[in-house]
Regions:
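Short, flexible loop motifs at catalytic/binding sites
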Residues: 1-221
Length: 221
């Protein structure tokens, strides 16, 4: 409730399943505004919002993403052309992204580079994904994750600009997009299987499974 928000004073706040919240909390304000107000006076205020995105135009996380100083996705180097790129679903209208043979979709799924169209399997990707970097859409920010490089052997990270120069001030507000294909716990074959089932359901008149695929699997509104 709005009263619960007002009773808290925090150093940091985390909002899970952000898009499941009402647009306004008890006709007071949106959940982000209420949570953010509780951070006033904090020494190092930080607010983290995460969610499965829902309806375009009504999504809390979409609004926060659009307001971000840097919108990041994880990019690894293509083994064919040595150019970085994220994993992207693609589609029938483009030559990059996930492709498969109709005769054996699950056994032939590959991800095609948007630069050289070179194809990789999930095993290929998992063999080199750890060398990737978080890159902003604008290309001005790069976040490098370095396991075990911090104090006491803890994981650490650092920021650079597009030219590789260390940044003294990282962006204050970042948005990160990640979707199911990045997970080593889900096979690309399973994603293709789910997609084909959703398409078949839509052809039969049920659009809900495909809408769920867009939200839950692709992480899009």
């Amino acid at each position: 409730s709005a009263g619960n928000y007002r009773r808290m004073t925090l150093q940091s706040a985390k909002i899970d399943e952000f898009d499941a919240f009402d647009l306004k909390i008890e006709k007071s304000a949106d959940p982000f505004t209420l949570a953010h107000k509780r951070l006033e006076g904090a020494t190092h205020p930080k607010i983290l919002c995460g969610t499965t995105p829902r309806i375009k135009g009504l999504s809390h996380i979409e609004k926060r993403e659009n307001a971000a100083e840097a919108r990041l996705n994880y990019r690894s180097t293509c083994p064919h052309c040595q150019v970085e790129h994220p994993l992207m679903w693609g589609g029938g209208h483009v030559a990059w992204g996930f492709k498969w043979d109709r005769e054996d979709p699950e056994g032939t799924v590959r991800h095609h580079c948007p630069h050289c169209r070179g194809a990789i399997t999930q095993a290929d990707y998992l063999a080199h994904w750890a060398g990737g970097v978080w890159v902003s859409d604008c290309g001005n920010y790069r976040c490098h994750y370095v396991p075990g490089s911090g104090p006491d052997g803890r994981d650490d990270y650092y920021w650079t600009d597009g030219a590789g120069m260390r940044l003294l001030r990282p962006p204050r507000h970042v948005a990160v997009h990640i979707w199911t294909a990045y997970s080593p716990q889900t096979t690309w074959a399973a994603i293709v299987r789910q997609f084909l089932q959703c398409v078949a359901a839509k052809v039969a008149g049920d659009k809900a499974p495909l809408e769920g695929f867009i939200n839950e699997t692709l992480g899009e509104t």
